[in-house]
Structures are given as C-alpha cells and as structure tokens.
C-alpha cells in the first residue's frame, strides 16, 4: 500500500470517527441554569390552565393544619403568589414532615400533606402557610409562560435529595452530594471531593465554562479549584454576551445568577425573599442572548431549580427503588441512605430541536423500571449527547432518566422560535435591603470566599468569618475574593506550577475586608 493511500484511509477513519461521535445529536452546546428554592406547583402548577396535559393544579389541592386531627381545617392551594418573605422551611427534617406529615417515612406513595402543618410550626400567624399554599398565575411569570408554550416542560422532575440547596446542587454536576444532607459550612468551604461531569468533559477534550456574577457556587466542588481550570471561569457581565455573539460558548456552559440582593444589582436567583421579577429578567436575558447567537441551532438550554424551598407540591416524591449514588450514608442523627428523592421542581428545556408545547412526563421505565428525572439526569444526558466514553459518575446518574429523545424528533431545527420573550412583571414593592444580615446560603458563599482568599486562617472558622456581615458587605467580600483567587491561579500557572494542584492563597497576602 502506498503512503498516499494509507494517508487517505487514515483521513477517512478520522472522519468516520468524528461523524460517529456527533451524528446522534445536533446539540453541540449545553447551557445549564439552576435557580433557587421553588416547587413545580408554586412556579408552574397553574400552567395547566394553558395546557391540560401538564400535571399541575386546579385549586382542589389542600393540606390540613394538623395532619393527626381528622377534623382539622384545610387550606386550599391558590394562585395568589407574589413577593415571599420570610423563607419557608426546607431542611431535611422539615421536608420529611412536608412529605409524610410525620416522622414515619414508611408510606408509599407519601401523602404530601404536611406543608401547612410544618409552616405553622415555624410561623403560627399563618402567613407562611398561606405563602406555601399559593402558586403564580402564568401572567405573573410571563417568561416561563412563553418558554413552556414554545418548548418543553418536565412535569415529573424531582430534586435529587430531600434536603436543602447545596446537597442538591452537588447532584447537578456530579450525581452525588458525597453524603451531605445539609448545608455543612466546613465541608462546603473545604470543597467536596467527588468526580464531576466537568472532569469527564475535560478528559475527553470537550470545553466547559462557568459564567458567574457574585461568586460561582460550583467552587464547592474541590476539583474545580485546580489551577488547570482557572481559565474556565468568566464574568457573566463581561463575557457571556460577547462569547455568545462570537459563537464561542463552551460545549458545557454553566450560568450562575446574582445571589446577593443589593440596590444596584438585585439578586436574580429566585431564592426567597428575592424578587421573582429579577429571576424572570435574568432568564429572559439568557434566552435572548442564546437565541441571537450563531450557536443557537446547536444549543440546548436547561433551566431547573435546586429544590422546592418549602413550597407545596401535590405529586408524591419517589421513595422506593432509588439507588444510593455511592453507598455513603448521611451523618447523624438521620443516617440517610439516599434512597428517596426530593420534591418536584420546575424544569424547562429550550432548543430549536424541541417541538412547541412539549410536555415531558416520566422517563417511561428507562434506563431502569424505577428511573426518574432528577438532577442527575443532567450529567447522564450530557454523557449521551456528547457520547462520552467515561463511566457514569455514580450509580445515581446511571439510573436517572435521560431526555435526548425530545431532541431527536425533528429532522431540522425550528425557524419560528421567538427572538424575544415577554417583559416580566414587577412583583416586589420597594427595593432590596442590602443592609440585611446574610442568609444561611449567603453565609456559605462568604465562607467559600474566605477559603479562596486565604482568610479562613485569620479567625475561628467557619462561624466568625461572616458574623455580622451585611448583604452589601458580603457581596463586596466575595467578589474581591474571586478576583484574587483567579489572579493567584493565573500567576501560579505563569510560574510553571503543576496544573493539577489547587489554587492556594496565603493569608499574609490578603485582608479580611476588601
């Protein structure tokens, strides 16, 4: 065989391999946005009025004030949601009461009857129970109303674990919380050790990027603090629109919101007591940026919520035949075995490859008879769409339902996708209280910032680092920490440091406040 003929065969082999990798999916860019603390019924339940196929609400749903009292007064689910303050209960024990009505977790399916009772235990005035038993009219969340009508809504997507924010956020990109059932400040700040979809993508030379605003919560994964990933972090305000316009968004793009609620830059994460209006503006901006990008016809946008935030949902959460991701048992006193899911959350998929008005129910017994859609479905679907050869991250993403099928119905991308979405409706009266003390989630972000900056060595960690800090102070602190963290990483790389090492800041080079 001649050298020329051999070279031709080699070229054909490479072409065939490339086509094999990409032929099954038109999607080359996956964009993930994880919002905060709202249930499906609370945000999207009333969309059933627009499309009866959606498993939403009709107003007949209710919860008793006292589960154990057969004659207890019941509160019906309404459509009067607006600005919510304070934040309803969503700890592990609070969710157990909301789902089962008591500490007895043996009922299958669970009755989902303890939301009002649990809210009354936190607020006997009844204000909180009224909040958790109300949802938004579609016109109050017009951006979602449009996306649900134009693209796909999942009406059976659950949080991965019946717990709070960070354990569920961990599942989104790694299929496990590494045993966490609560927002443990020390573990979060030190970083969780599990392998992530980012690592798998990097190993197979797929690009990824994180577009952050205050500080990226994905840095709770320890591996993302490695020097080799320093250039994966981009300022949302400075880079996202430019990268999208230039067609340079990474294959796996994560967009993080503003978590700090300030006068000039209100929070956009939907976490109570933040204004849903700002969250709608944020989603509108992300969509319209992607829609105008030359990458649009190869893009999938996934919008989900980390957990339900204490709000009512009528669909029983799966409590049987859910596999533990890695065999790790949660800490005392609950010793949770990660064998049931959390409460249903809003999830929307957007792409020109999705038919209008698509409603996605369960995964129909695939890949396992008990499989469900939950946050681990994201890395599982990424693996399929990008044909990754690496093993599943855990038993959970191996089990989770995947949704590549909704992108495989059409032979060509749609050309009628709206270029703009409706203007959101202002909900909160008044302005952000930037002088308020930090919430639990915001404290965790400040504690993360302290580790990135090296300040955790300056005081008793972790409680003291954010003690007495206001929202505006916390915002400035974490943004300064992120700036210094990235600068230190770039400098270390320029000096020839090992790219597999973590970025380490020296306390002597930083101060507690910027």
From Swiss-Prot:
Induction: Not induced by inorganic phosphate deprivation. The keyword Secreted applies. Keywords: Hydrolase, Secreted, Signal. Gene3D superfamilies: Alkaline Phosphatase, subunit A (3.40.720.10). It comes from the Eukaryota. Its EC number is 3.1.-.-. This is Non-specific phospholipase C2. It comes from Arabidopsis thaliana (Mouse-ear cress).
């Amino acid at each position: 065989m001649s050298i020329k003929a051999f070279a031709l065969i080699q070229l054909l082999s490479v072409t065939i391999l490339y086509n094999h990798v990409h032929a099954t999916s038109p999607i080359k860019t996956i964009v993930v946005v994880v919002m905060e603390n709202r249930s499906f019924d609370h945000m999207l339940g009333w969309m059933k009025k627009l499309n009866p196929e959606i498993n939403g609400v009709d107003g007949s749903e209710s919860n008793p004030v006292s589960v154990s009292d057969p004659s207890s007064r019941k509160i019906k689910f309404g459509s009067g949601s607006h600005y919510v303050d304070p934040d309803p209960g969503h700890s592990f024990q609070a969710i157990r009461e909301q789902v089962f009505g008591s500490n007895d977790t043996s009922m299958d399916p669970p009755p989902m009857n303890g939301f009002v009772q649990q809210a009354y235990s936190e607020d006997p005035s009844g204000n909180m129970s009224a909040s958790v038993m109300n949802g938004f009219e579609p016109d109050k969340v017009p951006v979602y109303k449009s996306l649900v009508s134009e693209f796909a809504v999942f009406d059976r997507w659950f949080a991965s674990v019946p717990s709070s924010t960070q354990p569920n956020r961990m599942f989104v990109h790694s299929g496990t919380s590494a045993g966490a059932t609560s927002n443990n400040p020390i573990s979060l700040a030190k970083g969780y050790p599990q392998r992530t979809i980012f690592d798998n993508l990097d190993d197979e030379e797929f690009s990824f990027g994180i577009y952050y605003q205050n500080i990226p919560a994905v840095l709770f994964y320890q591996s993302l603090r490695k020097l080799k990933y320093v250039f994966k972090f981009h300022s949302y305000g400075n880079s996202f629109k430019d990268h999208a316009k230039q067609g340079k968004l990474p294959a796996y793009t994560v967009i993080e919101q503003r978590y700090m609620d300030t006068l000039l830059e209100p929070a956009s994460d939907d976490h109570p007591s933040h204004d849903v209006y700002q969250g709608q503006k944020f989603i509108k901006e992300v969509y319209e940026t992607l829609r105008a990008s030359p990458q649009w016809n190869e893009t999938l946008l996934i919008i989900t919520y980390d957990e339900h935030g204490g709000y009512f949902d009528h669909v029983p959460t799966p409590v049987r035949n859910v596999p533990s991701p890695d065999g790790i048992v949660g800490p005392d006193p609950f010793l949770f075995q990660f064998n049931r899911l959390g409460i249903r959350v809003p999830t929307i998929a957007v792409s020109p490859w999705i038919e209008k008005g698509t409603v996605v129910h369960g995964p129909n017994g695939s890949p396992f008879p008990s499989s469900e859609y939950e946050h681990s479905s994201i890395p599982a679907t990424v693996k399929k769409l990008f044909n990754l050869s690496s093993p599943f991250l855990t038993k959970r993403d191996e089990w989770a339902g995947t949704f590549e099928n909704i992108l495989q119905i059409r032979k060509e991308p749609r050309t009628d996708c709206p270029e703009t979405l409706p203007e959101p409706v202002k909900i909160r009266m008044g302005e952000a209280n930037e002088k308020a003390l930090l919430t639990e989630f915001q404290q965790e972000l400040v504690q993360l910032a302290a580790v990135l900056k090296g300040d955790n060595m300056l005081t008793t960690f972790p409680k003291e680092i954010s003690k007495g800090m206001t929202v505006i102070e916390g915002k400035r602190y974490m943004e300064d920490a992120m700036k210094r963290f990235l600068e230190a990483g770039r400098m270390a790389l320029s000096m020839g440091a090992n790219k597999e090492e973590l970025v380490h800041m020296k306390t002597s080079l930083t101060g507690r406040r910027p």
